[in-house]
Amino acid sequence: MKQLLEFIPLILFFAVYKLVGVQAAAITLVLATILQLILVRILFKKLETSQWIVGLSVIIFGILTAYFDDLAFLKWKVTIINGLFAAVLLISQYVFHKPVVKMLLAKELSLPTQVWNRLNLGWAIFFIICMLINIIISQLFSDDTWATFKTFGFTGLSLVAVIITGIYLYPYIKKLENNNEQK
C-alpha cells in the first residue's frame, strides 16, 4: 500500500506532463507529493527518513521546475537522490561498519555479516547505476524520453533489484524457516 502511495505522484506527473506540459506537471507532482506524505503519515503513523528526503527534494526541485518551466531541476533531483542514497550506504558500511540495510531489516531477518555487507553494497551499486543512467538519459535524450524512463524505466529497474534481492536472500530465509520449524 505504501509503495502504491509513493507511485501515485509519479504517475500523475507523467500524465500531466504528456497532456499539458512541464509547469503543470511539476505543480501536480509537488501537490501530489505533499498529499502523499500526509496520507502516509496518517495511515502508517510514521514517515521514514528516506521518505522525508525524497519528499522534500521533490517539493524543492518541483517548485524550481515549475517556476523556471525547466525540467532540468527534476532531472538533477533524480541524480542527487540516487547519489545520496549510494553515498549513505557506502559510508555506513565502509566508514561506520554498520550497513544501513542491516539497520533497516535486522528486526525481520537474522543474517551473517557478510550477507548484510553484500546486500548493502548491492543496493549502493544499484543507486550508482540509476544515477549514471539518469545522467545519460537526461543529457542525451529528449525530455519526453527522460520523463517516460523516469516513470517506467526506474520503476522496472527497482522491481528487478527487489527480485534479485529476494533471490539472493532466499537461501537464508529458507534456512531461518527450517530452523524455526525444528524448534
Curated annotation (Swiss-Prot):
The keyword Methyltransferase does not apply. It is a multi-pass membrane protein. It is found in: Cell inner membrane. The chain crosses the membrane at residues 22-44, 53-73, 76-96, 121-141, 153-173. The keyword Signal does not apply. Its main location: membrane. Coiled coil: none annotated. It comes from the Bacteria. InterPro entries: YciB. GO terms for cellular component: plasma membrane. Keywords: Cell inner membrane, Cell membrane, Membrane, Transmembrane, Transmembrane helix. Belongs to the YciB family. NCBIfam families: ispZ, PRK00259.1-2. Plays a role in cell envelope biogenesis, maintenance of cell envelope integrity and membrane homeostasis. PANTHER family: INNER MEMBRANE-SPANNING PROTEIN YCIB, INTRACELLULAR SEPTATION PROTEIN A-RELATED. This is Inner membrane-spanning protein YciB.
